[in-house]
């Protein structure tokens, strides 16, 4: 059994999702297309030709899904607000019907005793803004801040915990450099400019959120990976340093007041469109930092590739998930301690952590996923070890509440604690979901014991 006794008494136990991955209803109640609607409907971009048109049909099943959150024992739910549902024009007036949906969701969560954690951007940029340059232009940063203000003005009396962006690395590097995610570009200059305007949009949104809600608690969510060299050669050591810059430092340093890493500015060779005051805006003080963790990266030099000229290599004999990602819980502990010791972060949430496996529904209707149970236990134990060494970890959000549209992988990759039969929309709590609820109960029992003592 995992030793989780080091987790604080007020530890937040959550589950997480994202709008495009679960909502469906892409053309209902005034929602406009997002870049992911465009991307997923482009032949060859998503495995199986899958789209988010229906997904988990969460838009029509909110009460049922809130019930599942409670069944899993979670006391917090991290969801994202769909920008094209709330401001279909990208900028300008609010679509009342779109914002009403999140109003009902928040009220339902609070009635069920679940704390809402809202993410304002989880990759679904309105296509109308992409048509005008998307994140490669400064105006999108400004429109994002205006949209953030509109959402917080409506929900901020009940939602106190806000994330500006989810995994901006994926939006910039995978969406604009590697082309494997929307908008599907392969342009280093566009990618670097997008990274900058995502950061600027974050900083402007922090200002907008605080102006709209004086007691808001604001953070950002970054996906990070420990980086290790494949060998002790000078080339691999240098490649690991560049990969760390590309994956970690580029996304942490500016928002935490250190500016952009000069070695990576030189590596990319792209002029950043910095205006006076921008770096201060980007480094607006935060109340918490969100960490999404899935795997470490072991890299070797790749001089013929694109920036950062480092290529990930496989680990012989490693345990792998259905994503072919190595299971390495120690990496989560390493990152939590790095954020604490190197960056001085004062409050951290693990905002995503989870695994995909080839789940099978048994004859009796149950779904047994022992690999995911083990994964959960190992990563929560890593969290507890980090807390024991001083990490200010305030909570953990399992990815994901339920199986959903896994971006370019379509519906083949299942991350949920709850199984979804996409043909019928039937939800079934997996063994991992039952175990998660058990871990929450055990922690609550320890908390009551500490209080009684």
Question: Model-found features: residue ranges?
Answer:
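Active-site region of glycoside hydrolase catalytic domains
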Residues: 2-46, 70, 89-91, 99-453
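A common structural microfeature
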Residues: 10-12, 59, 76
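Active-site mouth loops of central-metabolism enzymes
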Residues: 47-61, 138
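Internal amphipathic alpha-helical repeat/solenoid segments
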Residues: 58-65, 88, 98
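Catalytic domains of carbohydrate-active enzymes, especially glycoside hydrolases
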Residues: 61-82, 284, 288
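Glycine-rich, proline-tolerant flexible connector loops at the mouths of alpha/beta enzymes
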Residues: 81-94
């Amino acid at each position: 059994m995992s030793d989780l006794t080091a987790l604080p008494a007020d530890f937040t136990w959550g589950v997480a999702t994202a709008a495009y991955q679960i909502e469906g209803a892409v053309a209902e109640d005034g929602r406009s297309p997002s870049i992911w609607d465009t991307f997923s409907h482009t032949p060859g971009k998503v495995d199986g030709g899958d789209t988010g048109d229906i997904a988990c049909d969460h838009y029509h099943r909110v009460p049922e899904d809130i019930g599942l959150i409670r069944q899993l024992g979670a006391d917090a739910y991290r969801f994202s607000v769909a920008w094209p549902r709330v401001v279909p024009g990208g900028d300008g007036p609010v679509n009342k019907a779109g914002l009403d949906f999140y109003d009902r969701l928040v009220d339902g969560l609070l009635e069920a005793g679940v704390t809402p954690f809202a993410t304002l951007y989880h990759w679904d940029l309105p296509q109308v803004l992409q048509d005008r340059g998307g994140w490669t232009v400064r105006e999108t940063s400004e429109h994002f801040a205006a949209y953030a203000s509109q959402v917080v003005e409506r929900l901020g009396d009940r939602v106190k915990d806000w994330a500006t962006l989810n995994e901006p690395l994926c939006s910039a590097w995978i969406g604009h450099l590697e082309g494997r995610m929307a908008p599907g570009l392969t342009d280093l200059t566009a990618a670097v400019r997008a990274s900058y305007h995502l950061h600027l949009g974050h900083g402007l949104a922090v200002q907008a959120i605080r102006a709209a809600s004086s007691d808001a608690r604001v953070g950002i969510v970054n996906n990070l990976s420990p980086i290790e060299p494949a060998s002790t050669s000078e080339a691999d050591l240098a490649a690991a340093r560049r990969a760390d810059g590309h994956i970690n430092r580029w996304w942490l340093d500016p928002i935490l007041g250190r500016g952009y890493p000069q070695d990576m500015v030189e590596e990319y060779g792209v002029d950043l469109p910095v205006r006076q005051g921008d770096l201060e805006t980007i480094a607006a003080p935060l109340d918490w930092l969100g960490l999404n963790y899935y795997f470490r990266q072991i890299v070797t030099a790749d001089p013929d590739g694109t920036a950062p000229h480092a290529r990930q290599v496989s680990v012989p004999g490693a345990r792998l998930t259905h994503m072919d990602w190595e299971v390495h819980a120690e990496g989560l502990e390493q990152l939590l301690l790095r954020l604490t010791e190197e960056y001085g972060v004062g409050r951290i949430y693990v905002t995503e952590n989870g695994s995909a496996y080839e789940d099978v529904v048994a004859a009796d209707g149950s779904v047994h996923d022992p690999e995911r149970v083990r994964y959960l236990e190992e990563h929560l134990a890593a969290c507890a070890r980090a807390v024991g060494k001083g990490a200010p970890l305030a909570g953990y959000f399992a990815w994901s509440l339920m199986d959903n549209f896994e971006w370019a992988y379509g519906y083949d990759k299942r991350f949920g604690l709850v199984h979804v039969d996409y043909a019928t929309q039937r939800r079934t709590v997996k063994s991992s979901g039952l175990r998660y609820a058990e871990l929450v109960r055990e922690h609550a029992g320890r908390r009551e014991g500490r209080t009684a003592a």
